[in-house]
Structure formats: C-alpha cells, structure tokens
C-alpha cells in the first residue's frame, strides 16, 4: 500500500522499468536478426524482412487478444477468488493454441499465393518460406508464453519477465549469429537461421516462465501444469470478449 506521491511514483518505476526492458528485449531480437541477415546477403534480407512483417501482423493481433487474461486474473486476485486462476490460465492456453492453428492454416493455404501477388523475387520468396517454416517451430510456445507472462505480470512479478525475456534475447542473438554465418560448429543456413533463432528464443521463454509458475511461492499454489482444466466456453468467451477488441486496436 502506498500513501504519498513519492511512494506511488517509486512503485510505478519498479513496475514500469522491467516491462520497458522486456519490450526493448523483444524488439531488439528482431533488429539483430534483420541486421545480421542484411550482412549475409540482400536476397536473404528481403526474404526475412518480408516474412517478419507477415508473421508480426498476425502476432500483434494474437498478443492483444491474449491480453484478455490480465484484467480477469487481477480481478480474481482483488476479490481473493484465487481458486479460479488455474482454470482461467488454461483457457488462455487453449485460446493461444487455437490462434496458432489458425495462423498455421492461413500460412499453409495463403503464403505462396500472397508472395506471388507481392511480386517477390523467387529466391527471396524461398528464403521467406523457409524462414517462416523455421519460425513455425516456435509458434505455439510464442502464443502460450503470452498467457504465462500475463499471469506472472498480474502478480506484480514483472522483474521475472524482464530476466526471462532478456535471457531469450541472448539465446536469439547467439542462434542468429551461429546459424546465419555458420559459427561455433553450426551449419551456415543464411536468413533461415533467423527463423530458428526466434523459435529457440520462444521455447526458452516457455520453459523459463513454466519454471516460475511451478516454483515461485506466489504461483505454485495454483498447481498449474499439475491440475489440468478442461476447455470452458464461458471463460473462453469472457477472455475473447475482452481480448479481441484489444487485438484489433493494436
């Protein structure tokens, strides 16, 4: 509880700083990937840049939609109805899984026709397709992590998100550098390596956030990943009712 303006400002800074560093880490990974790909070849740069902009469009909407869990959990915490948090958490995972499946189907059916319509050079189009295939390995954990991170952040544990996302940023940079140029015994695969770098970072995020949910004293009482909850149309609809407008507004 805070009583003075200084205390409120300090609390805001404590919450805002980790979130700010988290966002810079998320953006920084992509910047490094595109920069390194540009150093490798212009064709790979064109393919990766096109692929990045395509998946980012869908991801921003999905990320906004999955934000619907945050106010629900915050409300439950305020009302001290924590028994329902585990159920809400699983509905977020189900929504993330559904969104990932939709994105995959759209990609499988529409990617090549779209690249043809964009008149992308054939060599760059092949790099784009291979990059997105590599990225797809991390698509499910990428969307699951939104639910995990939002749950952690709802409990005021934003410093964990900062540490985890920064760690995944390091993993992303390492895999990008290693796979694009073929360093440290890794194969040289050019721009496609940027896709594997993102996928590796996504799985790193998922594993580390899962460990926080399983081990942190504030969170382990929910028995997440131990007591599974079936899909609930009521809770899924509630999250989508809040999240979809956020997704469109972003």
Show the residue positions of the predicted features:
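Alpha-helical transmembrane segments of multi-pass membrane transporters/permeases
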Residues: 96, 151-178, 192-195, 199
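Transmembrane helix-bundle signature of multi-pass secondary active exporters and lipid flippases
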Residues: 17-71, 135-142, 237-250
């Amino acid at each position: 509880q805070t009583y003075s303006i200084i205390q409120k400002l300090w609390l805001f800074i404590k919450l805002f700083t980790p979130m700010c560093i988290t966002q810079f880490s998320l953006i920084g990974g992509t910047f490094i990937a595109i920069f390194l790909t540009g150093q490798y070849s212009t064709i790979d740069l064109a393919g990766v840049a096109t692929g990045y902009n395509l998946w980012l469009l869908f991801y921003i909407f999905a990320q906004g939609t999955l934000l619907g869990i945050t106010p629900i959990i915050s409300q439950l915490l305020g009302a001290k109805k924590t028994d329902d948090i585990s159920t809400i958490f699983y509905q977020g995972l189900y929504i993330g899984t559904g969104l990932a499946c939709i994105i995959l189907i759209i990609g499988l059916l529409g990617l090549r026709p779209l690249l043809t319509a964009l008149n992308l050079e054939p060599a760059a189009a092949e790099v784009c397709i291979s990059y997105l295939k590599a990225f797809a390995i991390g698509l499910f954990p990428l969307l699951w992590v939104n639910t995990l991170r939002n749950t952690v952040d709802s409990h005021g544990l934003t410093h964990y998100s900062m540490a985890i996302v920064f760690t995944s940023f390091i993993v992303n940079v390492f895999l990008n550098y290693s796979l694009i140029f073929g360093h440290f015994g890794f194969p040289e695969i050019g721009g496609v390596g940027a896709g594997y770098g993102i996928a590796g970072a996504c799985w790193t995020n998922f594993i580390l956030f899962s460990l926080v949910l399983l081990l942190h004293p504030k969170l382990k009482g929910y028995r997440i990943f131990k007591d599974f909850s079936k899909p609930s149309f009521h809770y899924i609809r509630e999250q989508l009712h809040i999240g979809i407008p956020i997704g469109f507004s972003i």
